[in-house]
């Protein structure tokens, strides 16, 4: 008899806990409606399938249509469906398994856009990166045991703790499948040009056809997170930890997820409020290096107004010839910032018995090494990725105009060396040291991060900096060197974050392509930003709706508490 009574009390506590959990879910589901303006709610209702209501369940086909995900991309659809499924259960991210409704899609929008999430959760330190990683790592189709016991769930005072602990999530245990992340990032990169504004029109067919092209740049980002991944096939059996994910995004790709935020807010606009992205004309005359997909990778760390407007081709070695003279004639008239691109194939001579097999075959390379001073074998510490992937791509952002500098240096603290392939890394100029670039027309070539070479009748000698990129005067060979701190450039951001700034290595490579592209001046870029801001403000203006003509949508507004009784609508 006593056992029966005890069991009844236990069941009662469990049911009470479940009820309180459901009440919390209902509270946040209803709260999400109050975070949106009248126009946003009406627009969203207009975007869901005809005849469907906010509390109806969402099908995969709805996700495909509303978020421009190709119907034949099973991996991408699965990733997004799981993401929405996880967010639908906020704040009980791990303890609840409710299905996705159209109302919870609105909740997902709030949770993935940081500015909205801070208001929605009433938490200034809300971390949208953590929330996204949870949605990518948890599998909501696999029901697990609740992480929190009934006593914790039944204590109303602990709800703030539930939210701020992300429902007791242990981030050290979370991992994202690298293949899922590869597909996810390919879509995000492809969207970077389409979603430069929240209300840009998106061509689904064009987006679907271009996704394969963006997988190569997505792979560079994935390898940045996990250097043990070499090829796309490696992604199938590899994973990414939260530390790897967050370090890569925060340190070298801070703009990576901006297109996702734009996409999430895209559903808050009616078709009539969308604008043609005339500001985003396809890049004219793309080259082997600079094309739509490469621009998307640049946009992960450079401001969008630099990458997606007034990007002007100045010099392409394949077209104008690989010479300092051609470079000078094409580039030196540009009085605004530029980006120098250098692509090549790494020379694998570190494993040779004598370290000079290629030098024996190529006397020009042998002479270059004698002038430069090859890093000693015992100081060459290349990881597996660097050894197996020969292709290298560097970009150098320079604010100062180019000029002949046979004695002095130019370039200020904004100069950056960026590695784009096979991984992404950023090397910042030391703000306390002046001058970091030379363009030497008497045989010294181009140097970033080095002192001027000494050139005499009987030869020359380079003085590479601790972190530097050197290009010989024939634009045939290049060397990127990394010895740590002490030069005019700092060690890589990720390298430093991982505590590996003292690791020494260098990439010696045969140059295949050299390009220089001009960016707009500050005045032009400011005008572009103002134009985009005007476009978004204009969309908001057009979005205003006459509430008296809403008819059937009035019930939706009453549900959100925007109209009804003594209210007349408006935003919360």
UniProtKB/Swiss-Prot annotation:
Main location: cytoplasm
Protein name in UniProt: Restriction of telomere capping protein 5
Presence of the UniProt keyword Glycoprotein in the record: no
Name of the coding gene: RTC5
Keywords recorded for this protein, A-Z: Cytoplasm
Annotated family: Belongs to the RTC5 family.
Keyword tRNA-binding included in the entry's annotation: no
InterPro entries: TLDc_dom (IPR006571)
Physiological role: May be involved in a process influencing telomere capping.
Domain TLDc: 288-520
Gene Ontology cellular component annotations, sorted alphabetically: cytoplasm
SMART domains documented for this protein: TLDc
Subcellular location: Cytoplasm
Lineage: Eukaryota, Fungi, Dikarya, Ascomycota, Saccharomycotina
